[in-house]
Amino acid sequence: MDHEEIPSTPSTPATTPGTPGAPLFGGFEGKRNGHNGRYTPKSLLKSCKCFSVDNEWALEDGRLPPVTCSLPPPNVSLYRKLGAEFVGTLILIFAGTATAIVNQKTDGAETLIGCAASAGLAVMIVILSTGHISGAHLNPAVTIAFAALKHFPWKHVPVYIGAQVMASVSAAFALKAVFEPTMSGGVTVPTVGLSQAFALEFIISFNLMFVVTAVATDTRAVGELAGIAVGATVMLNILIAGPATSASMNPVRTLGPAIAANNYRAIWVYLTAPILGALIGAGTYTIVKLPEEDEAPKERRSFRR
């Protein structure tokens, strides 16, 4: 019976992705059988402290009982988290900035849709590949907003932001070495007035953080599709504000290329508006989401965590 695969009843672990110190984009991971790498009834139950695997009767009907016990958060060291955050941010900044540079160099061959798709896909693949390790913040505004709402420990905020800034600068200088002297195409500068640029960056950062908070901290949101949902939001925001502000939404998307190109025009807009928008967006979702004690909706949902 140890090696027989038996489907389990869906459940919600007590350790949610929003728990301080736990990955923000993560899911259930039980222990696997050492011989074939498959989940077995006993390996699943052993990960839960509220079941005794000595009672074989619990498995005789061919299904596992509902699992409602607490699951310990993954034991990931801070160094691994920072490494994953650095690599993830590096990929994001390199992809988004490189597409903008190539678009300028080729007289618009990438098009606005291409730039939006590049950034959105980069966000999606990084969340899917590193979210279970570091939470895949990739953005100081996201880190600060999560910390403000107690979804992330404040003591880790400086080192997370440090990793993000280092990744941004590294990506920018790598691109400068490749594309010099066309590095200016990757710098986010507004083509509208400063007040309009600030408003647009605030709004699109609000949009982004509202969605991120939903999929990362609410177990009733479509957590398995977090990468797709956040990537699609980034694409939408670039289509909205790309021609006007370059749609930064991220202080390090602006900071690294600005340093590499020595172009700090209107940089204060891109360092302040995304953080304020993220704080308000995260707070707004926290206010409007269903209370934890509410009953689940009676109608069936297409996706569940």
UniProtKB/Swiss-Prot annotation:
Keyword annotations: Membrane, Phosphoprotein, Repeat, Transmembrane, Transmembrane helix, Transport
Domain free text: Aquaporins contain two tandem repeats each containing three membrane-spanning domains and a pore-forming loop with the signature motif Asn-Pro-Ala/Val (NPA).
Main location: membrane
Gene Ontology CC entries for this record: plasma membrane
Modified residues (Phosphoserine): S302
Molecular-function annotations in GO: active borate transmembrane transporter activity; channel activity; glycerol transmembrane transporter activity; urea transmembrane transporter activity
Functional description taken from the UniProt entry: Transports glycerol, urea and formamide, in Xenopus laevis oocytes. Very low water transport activity.
GO-annotated biological processes: borate transport; cellular response to boron-containing substance levels
Record has Membrane as a keyword: yes
Intervals of motif NPA 2: 250-252
The gene coding this protein: NIP6-1
Subcellular location per the Swiss-Prot or TrEMBL entry: Membrane
Family membership noted in the UniProt record: Belongs to the MIP/aquaporin (TC 1.A.8) family. NIP (TC 1.A.8.12) subfamily.
Protein's UniProt name: Aquaporin NIP6-1
Organism, scientific name: Arabidopsis thaliana
Expression sites (tissue/organ): Expressed in roots.
Gene3D superfamilies (UniProt xref): Glycerol uptake facilitator protein
Residues that span the membrane, as ranges: 82-102, 111-131, 159-179, 194-214, 221-241, 267-287
Low complexity: compositionally biased ranges: 7-23
Motif (NPA 1): 139-141
Lineage: Eukaryota, Viridiplantae, Streptophyta, Embryophyta, Tracheophyta
Pfam families associated with the record: MIP (PF00230)
Keyword Repressor appears in the UniProt entry: no
Region Disordered: start-end pairs: 1-30
Its membrane topology: Multi-pass membrane protein
